[in-house]
Every structure is written in C-alpha cells, then in structure tokens.
C-alpha cells in the first residue's frame, strides 16, 4: 500500500505542475518533511498497546508529513505504528520513518539540500542528525541545552542578540535569537551544524521554570543551513507546528482509533488512514488550487464539499426525476382515504370558555366542613 501511494503521489505531483510541492525546489525553497509522534488511546487490551508517558494506554505512532506551505495542507509520507511505551527520541525509529518519507518523495536516497527535514527535540540525537547529514539533506532539529546553560547564556554578548520574528515576519516583542555554536562542545555531532538559541519572556500568568534564566525561557535548535538571518531560520523551525495540524486531520480520517485486535491489522489501518488523508490532499491540490477550500480540514471539506453541495434528491414525478412516473413503486399505490375527523376519531373539543367564565365547583373536591366561600371570592 505504501508503494502504491508513492506511485500515485508522483503521478499527482506531475499533474499538479507548478502547484506541485516539488516544483522549483532548491536549497532556498526546499521540500519540507516534518516528523512528529502522537498518542492514540486504546480503550481495551490490544496487541502492542502499552502505557504511555502521559499516563494513558494505547499506541505511540511516529509520522512524517509533506508540508504544502501556508497556501495548502499536507500529505502523509509515512506512519510507523509503535507501542505506547516506545521512546520519543528513539533514533532507529526516526531513521526508518525518514527513510520511508524520502522514498515517498521519489528524489533519490540523497536528494541534497533541496529537501528540509524538521523534527522537534525528540529527533535531536547524534544518530538521527548524523543520518540526515549523511543523506545530505537540510535539517532543522530541536536541540537540548546542557545543564550549564546559565553559564553559556552569560557569555553571549548583547550585540549577538537579534529580534525574533512572528510567522508574518514582524518583530516579536520580548523575543530574541542568537547563535551559540562556538560556546558549546559539539564533539560527536556532524560538521557544519549550527546551534541557535531563542529567548523569550513568558506570557503574563505563565509559571516560571527552574531552567529559566534571568526571566527568559530558553530554547534551541540545530541546523546545517549556512545562509539566511537567524530570525528567519528560527521562524522556519517554529513552522514545524503545522505538523500538529496534519496529525489532527489524520485522526479525523482514521488514525484516531485502532478498533482491531492484532498489531498487524492495526498497521494496515494506519495505511488506510494515510491513504484517506492523501486522497483529500490530492483532491485539494488538483481541483481546489486558488480556492479557500485548498486549506480546509477533512471535516470541513466533507461537510461543505461532499455533503452540503450534493445535488438534491428529485421529487417523484418531477421534471428532473430520471424515472418515469408510472415506473415508481408508489405510483400504483391507492391513495389513503381521509379520516372522517381531523383528530382521528376523537370527539370534537368543547368550545373555549368565554372570558370571565368560572367552571362550576367539583363536588368531589369541595370542603366537607366550614362555611362556604363568598360568591365574589377571587
């Protein structure tokens, strides 16, 4: 099924022309592959289900996605079903999923810098980054800061900090970025890797953490991109959050539950869910380019494009009814005779009482003792 999806994907991309995700890709405008894991709850004991790190019970699949950018959605490149207790930063799993995603792209085993792989901190291991470097692709991977981060932060000169940007390119208030590659011991990491730190004031009401320094929340990521401003590289890395939207949409197409008992059967279900997600993405890519529906999620597409816009059912015997009136099974049914009374046999109701009329007292409910009430009593 995955091989068939790859063959159809390359055919769809060739039909899309200039709207294809691989149209005009280069080191400055690469094909983006996002890798992230998610949790899927299992409400009964199933093969492979296990406790998760969040206290639940189920599976921990690792996924990869082709990002269509701000003007589109995305496609499922690979899904690897794992037990719920699988490690979030397992390098072997990340390497397998990335290899399958590169095979789906059809650009060769070493596509070069025209492919960008983005991963959160779970992919920030020496094995995973080394694999990406050997494949000669661009990468932007979350980097775990060491324990002596406060000492590193104190060595950064003020002139090294540059304002961070929002997704729209405007400066972000209270956020800055700086490169700290020369301040770290990167022995064992691939050559040419850069580490960029981001500092930002926590939002009002947010709780401070023990690793916050001088009131700033510090994060970092690693990349092998040598050109571009630091703020632009940091925005490019944070746009990896679109992968969360793709995972949420995939859960609407079948990834959100695993009703089957066997692990192999649930792996097939993952492929079916990926195919359903890709069919919607391909339909939007080929038929809805330039329309707001190009970015709609599956539930919204289903309601507005498939269900809400279907043609109405023709009336029996109407001009738009393709069936002849005498061929309809209800044509020769004798009409039901009307009931002699509109209330279906009930006696007619008494006319409504006149205004100010009081019904006579019920003898069964009158008092057996005491004086009678006056006639003009309310």
Could you say what each language-model-derived stretch is?
Residues 1-67:
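Active-site-proximal, Lys/Arg-enriched surface segment
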Residues 43-48, 75-81, 91-92, 126-132, ...:
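Short acidic, glycine/serine/threonine-rich loops at helix termini
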Residues 280-378:
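A short, flexible helix-boundary coil/loop motif
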Residues 29-39, 74, 115-124, 139-142, ...:
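Short, conserved catalytic/metal-binding motifs centered on acidic residues
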Residues 92-148:
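Domain-level cores of phosphate- or acyl-group-handling catalytic modules
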């Amino acid at each position: 099924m995955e091989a068939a999806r790859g063959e159809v994907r390359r055919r769809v991309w060739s039909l899309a022309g200039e709207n294809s995700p691989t149209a005009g890709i280069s080191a400055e405008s690469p094909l983006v592959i996002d890798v992230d894991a998610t949790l899927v709850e299992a409400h009964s004991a199933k093969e492979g289900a296990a406790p998760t790190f969040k206290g639940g019970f189920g599976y921990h699949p690792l996924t990869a996605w082709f990002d269509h950018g701000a003007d589109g959605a995305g496609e499922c490149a690979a899904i690897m079903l794992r037990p719920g207790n699988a490690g979030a930063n397992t390098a072997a799993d990340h390497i397998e999923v990335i290899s399958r995603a590169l095979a789906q792209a059809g650009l060769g085993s070493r596509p070069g810098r025209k492919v960008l792989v983005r991963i959160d901190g779970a992919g920030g291991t020496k094995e995973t980054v080394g694999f990406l470097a050997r494949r000669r692709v661009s990468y932007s991977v979350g980097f775990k800061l060491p324990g002596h981060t406060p000492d590193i932060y104190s060595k950064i000169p003020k002139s090294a900090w540059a304002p961070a940007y929002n997704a729209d390119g405007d400066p972000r208030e209270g956020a800055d970025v700086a490169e700290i590659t020369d301040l770290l011991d990167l022995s064992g990491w691939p050559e040419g890797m850069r580490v960029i730190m981001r500092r930002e004031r926590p939002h009002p009401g947010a709780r401070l953490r023990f690793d916050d320094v001088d009131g700033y929340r510090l994060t970092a990521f690693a990349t092998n991109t040598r050109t571009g401003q630091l703020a632009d590289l940091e925005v490019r890395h944070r746009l990896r959050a679109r992968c969360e939207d793709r995972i949420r949409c995939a859960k609407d197409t079948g990834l959100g539950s695993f009703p089957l008992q066997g692990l192999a059967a649930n792996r097939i279900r993952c492929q079916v869910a990926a195919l359903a997600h890709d069919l919607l993405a391909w339909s939007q890519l080929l038929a809805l380019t330039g329309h707001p529906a190009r970015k709609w999620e599956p539930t919204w597409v289903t309601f507005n494009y498939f269900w809400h816009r279907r043609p109405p059912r023709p009336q029996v015997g109407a001009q738009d009814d393709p069936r002849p009136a005498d061929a309809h099974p209800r044509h020769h049914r004798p009409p039901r005779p009307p009931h002699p009374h509109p209330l279906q046999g009930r006696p007619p109701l008494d006319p409504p009482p006149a205004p100010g009329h009081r019904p006579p007292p019920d003898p069964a409910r009158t008092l057996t003792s005491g004086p009678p009430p006056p006639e003009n009593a309310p």
